[in-house]
């Protein structure tokens, strides 16, 4: 999924978000990360720092849900997926529920995956929800969110010039520029497709039918809603992504052959509408 750029104004999240937090972290450098062990340790520390800043920012907005009946649906699924994916990622993974009017999920540097309450209302079965989460943990596995953050930070530094990066106004200048670039922050088609395929593998490792992501594509295509998760939007080639998933399934019948492609085989979920939520403070 792409990092969130603009959230609906009718309630919940207003994430000019983790991208803006880049300006508070001077440890991110203008040069690409080197291959030395020391530089890799520095990069991991930078990622942890950025992840913590994102979390603190969302917590300050009071949109992270501490307790809700929705967790009774989310936690069993997310726990199984985290157990399956964690060996492939070097920082602890954690799944959080956040309040928003848009069905969405997104992974951020540092290992956090945020799932909006509206996605639980939209998803019709466990497999669709699992497919979304598996797609997101795949962005962590491939370090996509951190690489995108570093790339954007480097581009800004080149564009703004070294002179303005000195003094107390540097962060403000970077922030203003980032606001103007939020709409362009997108994962590439290849990155999204890779997350689809890795996500399918994670789903099977967690015990979930990997066809759930295909069904979710179809659900949004058939929906009257104009709101959809970022990783399903702005990609006119969704059909090619579905085709790539089907080809992936066919390439390994030992892994995927036991799962039904029929939506009728899915496990429905039922969540209480307008479920009460207590927010972290």
Positions of PLM-derived features:
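C-terminal capping/extension segments of zinc metalloprotease domains
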Residues: 3-6, 18, 30-53, 76, ...
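Bacterial N-terminal signal peptides
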Residues: 14-29
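Catalytic-site beta-strand/loop segments enriched in glycine and acidic/polar residues
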Residues: 38-40, 131-134, 140-141, 171-188
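N-terminal targeting signals for Sec/Tat export/insertion, comprising classic cleavable signal peptides
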Residues: 44-72
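Conserved beta-strand segments that form the floor/walls of ligand-binding pockets within enzyme
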Residues: 114
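Short pre-active-site segment immediately N-terminal to the catalytic Zn-binding motif
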Residues: 117-131
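Catalytic Zn2+-binding segment of zinc metalloproteases
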Residues: 127, 137-153
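Post-HEXXH active-site segment of zinc metalloproteases
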Residues: 146-176, 214
């Amino acid at each position: 999924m792409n990092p969130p750029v603009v959230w609906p104004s009718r309630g919940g999240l207003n994430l000019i978000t983790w991208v803006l937090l880049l300006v508070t972290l001077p440890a991110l450098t203008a040069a690409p990360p080197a291959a030395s062990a020391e530089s890799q340790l520095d990069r991991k520390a930078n990622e942890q720092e950025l992840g913590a800043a994102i979390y603190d920012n969302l917590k300050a907005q009071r949109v992270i849900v501490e307790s809700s009946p929705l967790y009774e649906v989310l936690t069993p699924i997310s726990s199984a997926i985290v157990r399956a994916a964690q060996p492939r990622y070097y920082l602890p993974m954690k799944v959080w529920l956040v309040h928003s009017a848009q069905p969405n999920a997104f992974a951020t540097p540092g290992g956090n995956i945020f799932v909006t309450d509206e996605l639980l209302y939209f998803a019709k079965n466990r497999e669709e929800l699992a497919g979304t989460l598996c797609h997101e943990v795949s962005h962590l596995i491939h370090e996509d969110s951190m690489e995108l953050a570093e790339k954007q930070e480097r581009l800004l530094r080149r564009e703004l010039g070294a002179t303005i990066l000195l003094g107390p106004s540097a962060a403000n200048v970077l922030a203003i520029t980032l606001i103007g670039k939020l709409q362009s922050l997108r994962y590439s088609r290849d990155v999204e497709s890779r997350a689809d395929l890795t996500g399918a593998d994670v789903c099977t490792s967690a015990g979930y039918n990997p066809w759930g992501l295909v069904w979710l594509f179809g659900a949004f295509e058939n929906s009257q809603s104009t709101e959809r998760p970022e990783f399903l939007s702005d990609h006119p080639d969704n059909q090619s992504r579905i085709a790539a998933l089907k080809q992936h399934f066919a390439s390994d019948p030992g892994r995927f052959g036991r799962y039904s492609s029929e939506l009728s085989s899915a496990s429905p979920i039922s969540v209480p509408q307008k479920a009460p939520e207590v927010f972290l403070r």
